[in-house]
Amino acid sequence: MARERQEMVVELKRYGISNARVLDAFLTVRRHLFVDAQSRPYAYSDNAMPIGFGQTISQPYTVAYMTSLLVERVPSGKVLEIGTGSGYQAAILAELGYRVYTIERIAGLYAAAGRVLDALGLPVHPRLGDGTLGWPEEAPFDGIIVTAAAPREPHTLMSQLAEGGVLVVPIGDLGSQQMTVIRRRGERFEHEIFHNFAFVPLCGREGWADNNE
């Protein structure tokens, strides 16, 4: 599916993604391995797709947009992803050379993503647990990416940023969120607000309640 990946990257460029490192990672990582057989023929379309358990793999543009926000501010280092999901975002981050830690709260997704990441030989450290609490034993992180909608600023995650570290997180209600970049400056935090997106909710002790639990 190399041709389909190339077409996806052309489309990402058309949508305004311009970072060469990010585009190269999207050319390399095989998205079709992170979706089920039924979705595989459409893996390189710019669409979110269900991955089970009420969760989705984000559309390529969204993943590229968030990744670009991180790469342009923190080009290397140790990164925490909240919400492993399919494992695709973690694979992109690993391809970019980050030391990747990722947390997933749903056991079925954690297991499935782990199998794919292991098969690809990617240096990703997965954990099953409540992502809203971060990974204090491995903190601080140079970057944190949250792949679900937070209802408010995630203060625990912010506290796990290294000096100068960056948190990329969609914040808002369940219908629409603003992509937000938060950078740590000592005990202060600088904020940048970007476009609106729609993500599945970030569930956990410091996120939304999970009505299925």
Swiss-Prot record:
GO terms for cellular component: cytoplasm. Keywords: Cytoplasm, Methyltransferase, S-adenosyl-L-methionine, Transferase. GO terms for molecular function: protein-L-isoaspartate (D-aspartate) O-methyltransferase activity. PROSITE patterns: PCMT. It catalyses: [protein]-L-isoaspartate + S-adenosyl-L-methionine = [protein]-L-isoaspartate alpha-methyl ester + S-adenosyl-L-homocysteine. The active site is at 58. Its main location: cytoplasm. Gene3D superfamilies: Vaccinia Virus protein VP39. The keyword Coiled coil does not apply. Its EC number is 2.1.1.77. GO terms for biological process: methylation; protein modification process; protein repair. It is found in: Cytoplasm. NCBIfam families: pimt (TIGR00080), PRK00312.1 (NF001453). Catalyzes the methyl esterification of L-isoaspartyl residues in peptides and proteins that result from spontaneous decomposition of normal L-aspartyl and L-asparaginyl residues. It plays a role in the repair and/or degradation of damaged proteins. Belongs to the methyltransferase superfamily. L-isoaspartyl/D-aspartyl protein methyltransferase family. This is Protein-L-isoaspartate O-methyltransferase. The gene is pcm.
